[in-house]
């Protein structure tokens, strides 16, 4: 047993040596999280995700299931001030609004307990999960176009154009599905360990355009298609999907002493490489080309939780999450 414990300790220390890319991890994988977000020492069925080693202390043997759905809606606003923006709408300050919608964010936890063993699984949306749409595009998109009248005026040495107009839109979605399987074993009556893996499948999509770009002439305010003035500038369209797979090893420990329970879970880094499936890319940006590959690692996560039963109907809990990002 000492050898097994030593190997577990070494594996936990490895968490500190794992580094990765952007942070995109959902930890609210059961509706119990909405009641109490400190689930790192749970011994209920949601522990299949939050504290899998704690499943050793399920109150009865046999199968246990939990099927959940959550919905999320969010508005993201950007207010940007940039002098050339005044060429379209006569205001240098512009407001861009994006609406995020996710009607279905499912998760399923299941466990089968027999003696000292518990076999468990979790399927959930471990990253992303919604669609975000900016109906008027983004400020970074429009900023490029807003500079064209000034640039043309400088080249011709006259105030030939006083503004611009365009149509812009961006819609994107990012979903990471995770399927987790693992085994929990009661090493002692009050001490258990878990070993498992999660297969992560990433599916991102992006659709957007900049089109109908026109320049406003100083002569009567007539709008002229930009290509008549700057042939190298035209409509830009983007339609692509990115997919990738990665596997994350997961280990966990749980210790129970009287009314106190402590759980520790470590998810190692998930190395993922996304591959583009591009239907259209006229942006001139090579990172959107078909078959282009992008690193998309999910960072390692160390979760520590504790809960104490003050009374049979009163429990206090606390948790700590550290992403090695």
Where on the chain are the PLM-derived regions?
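Residue-level detector of transmembrane insertion/anchoring sites
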Residues: 6-7, 41
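Outer-membrane beta-barrel porins/channels
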Residues: 21-38, 42-43, 103-107, 111-325
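A ubiquitous, low-specificity "background" feature that marks scattered single residues
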Residues: 8-10, 57, 195, 324
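Bacterial N-terminal signal peptides
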Residues: 7-17
């Amino acid at each position: 047993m000492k050898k097994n414990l030593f190997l577990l300790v070494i594996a936990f220390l490895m968490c500190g040596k794992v580094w990765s890319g952007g942070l995109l991890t959902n930890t609210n994988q059961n509706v119990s999280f909405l009641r109490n977000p400190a689930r790192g020492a749970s011994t209920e069925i949601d522990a299949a995700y939050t504290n899998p080693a704690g499943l050793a202390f399920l109150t009865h043997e046999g199968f246990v299931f939990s099927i959940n759905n959550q919905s999320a809606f969010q508005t993201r606003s950007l207010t940007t001030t940039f002098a050339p923006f005044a060429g379209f709408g006569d205001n240098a300050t512009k407001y861009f609004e994006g609406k995020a919608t996710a009607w279905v964010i499912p998760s399923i936890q299941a466990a089968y307990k027999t003696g000292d063993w518990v076999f468990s699984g979790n399927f959930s949306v471990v990253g992303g999960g919604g669609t975000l749409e900016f109906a008027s595009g983004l400020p970074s998109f429009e900023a490029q176009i807003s500079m064209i009248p000034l640039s043309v005026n400088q080249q011709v040495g006259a105030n030939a154009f006083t503004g611009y107009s365009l149509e812009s839109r961006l819609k994107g979605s990012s979903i990471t599905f995770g399927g987790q399987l693992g085994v929990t074993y009661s090493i002692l009556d009050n001490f258990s360990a878990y070993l498992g893996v999660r297969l992560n499948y990433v599916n991102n999509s992006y659709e957007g355009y900049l089109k109908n770009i026109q320049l406003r002439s100083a002569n009567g305010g007539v709008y002229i298609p930009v290509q008549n003035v700057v042939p190298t500038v035209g409509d830009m369209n983007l339609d692509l999907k990115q997919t990738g797979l990665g596997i994350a090893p997961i280990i966990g420990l749980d210790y129970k002493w009287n009314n106190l329970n402590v759980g520790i879970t470590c998810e190692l880094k998930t190395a993922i490489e996304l591959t583009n499936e591009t239907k259209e890319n006229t942006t001139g940006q090579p990172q959107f080309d078909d078959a282009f590959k992008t690193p998309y690692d999910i960072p390692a996560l160390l979760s520590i939780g504790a809960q104490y039963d003050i009374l049979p109907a009163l429990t206090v809990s606390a948790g700590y999450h550290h992403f090695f990002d």
